[in-house]
């Protein structure tokens, strides 16, 4: 058994991937790297290596260490870059009865005023198509602020500059003070929450 030092971020990440009681860090890393889990001698060595106090020549490191470190750091980087992406509920069906293609009318889109108008038109069209499932939009939220609510005041309480607008006469309100890219992201998340596949959702949102 070899002992190495890792930084705090790597330690927390590895610990967060524990799937069962008693699983060791080696077991977790082997699973993440798709390596077979082997029985290893866990007896403590006479001398424990402290890499931070020793020469860090790459030649002296076991190649699996570099592979594991690179893999874990890549996963952490990917997760950090995706922080703005709001998770879709796990209980959402992969497909629903909603005809997402039917909600887009090029003729009606062309009559809307700016990105806000197109954003509101697409949400209104989706609301009329989704029916009672539309309340899933309430699950789409930003960091510390609401994007959808059942009242204008709720959005204003979340952000004074939210510029809330009601989606048709549905009783649902949406913030509209975001730039076009953010509106597209919000609509994409709404569509995914309602069962639309990711690629189609992005394609529809590009109409904003």
Swiss-Prot record:
One Gene Ontology biological process: regulation of DNA-templated transcription
The family database entries (InterPro entries) matched by this protein are listed as: Arc_rbn_hlx_hlx (IPR013321), Ribbon_hlx_hlx (IPR010985), SeqA (IPR005621), SeqA_DNA-bd_C (IPR026577), SeqA_DNA-bd_C_sf (IPR036835), SeqA_N (IPR033761)
Please verify whether the record's keywords include Cytoplasm.
Answer: yes
Q: Does the keyword Flavoprotein apply?
A: no
Q: Gene Ontology terms, cellular component aspect?
A: cytoplasm
Keywords, A to Z, come to:
Cytoplasm, DNA replication inhibitor, DNA-binding
Show the segment(s) annotated as Interaction with DNA: 115-116
Write down the superkingdom of origin: Bacteria
Select a single GO molecular function from the record's annotations and give it.
Answer: DNA binding
Protein location: Cytoplasm
Question: Mainly resides where?
Answer: cytoplasm
Summary of the function given for this chain in its UniProt record? Negative regulator of replication initiation, which contributes to regulation of DNA replication and ensures that replication initiation occurs exactly once per chromosome per cell cycle. Binds to pairs of hemimethylated GATC sequences in the oriC region, thus preventing assembly of replication proteins and re-initiation at newly replicated origins. Repression is relieved when the region becomes fully methylated.
Q: How does it assemble?
A: Homodimer. Polymerizes to form helical filaments.
Give the protein family. Answer: Belongs to the SeqA family.
Q: Which HAMAP family does the protein's record reference?
A: SeqA
- What name is this protein filed under? Negative modulator of initiation of replication
